[in-house]
Amino acid sequence: MWASGGGPAADSNHNVYLSTGDGTFDVDKAGVDYGDSILKLSPGRLLLLDYFTPSNQAVLESQALDLGSGGVLLLPPQSTIPNNLLITAGKQGLIYLINRDNLGHYTMSQVVQQNGNIAGLFGTPTFWNNRLYFAGTTYTGGDSPRVFSFLGGRMSANPTSRAAGTYPYPGAVMVVSANGIKNGILWALQHGGTSSGNDVLRAYDALNLGRELYNSDQAGSRDLPGIVGMQFESIIVDNGKVYVPSTGAARLSVFGLLH
């Protein structure tokens, strides 16, 4: 498992959910291998409780289209049935919305919804205020961050807005800062976003990604975090500040309001 820097998810009963990368899948033939699968593990001993494997797993494995490049996101309880859902996507760019109380094994019976309206995902989706955020990409071409509405236990078929420009591989790890359900800001780190190769921290209106609020290339060299260097660092927002690790520049950049 790798999830491009994302960690396992856990529900209120302490069950653990994670995705796996390319490899052998032979559970349907009494084997023990779970390549390109979502696993649900018990608390404590981490015993296998349930799993989901796409019906095209053999294609994913043969073409290096890891499901495990994307992390697993558990969604808040829904008023509709099924009310406990998870969402993920992998390199193929196919989003899976799944009933996490019955993952379905090697069938598509418990897939509540599929959506192919993103490029391949390297990272974990982001959720805020009935919205889902993705920043997909491929090894050879970029894509832009986009947001889908999420209502009635289903996501919209098409993005409600998307950011201008493209994010090259590996896309972006994104996080939302907000005052509850108000004043949402989506933060994203764009790799190699300047002509000099520096990475750029960008802030968008979380309700309309077409509205950029800030980017770290606006003030010359003052705000540039440098070349991050590693592929899958996660940015962190806490107490009014944004923290960006930069192994390439051997520093931790901290962004906040100037006083």
Q: Where are these predicted regions, by residue range?
A:
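Acidic/polar loop-and-plug regions of large Gram-negative outer-membrane beta-barrel proteins
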Residues: 6
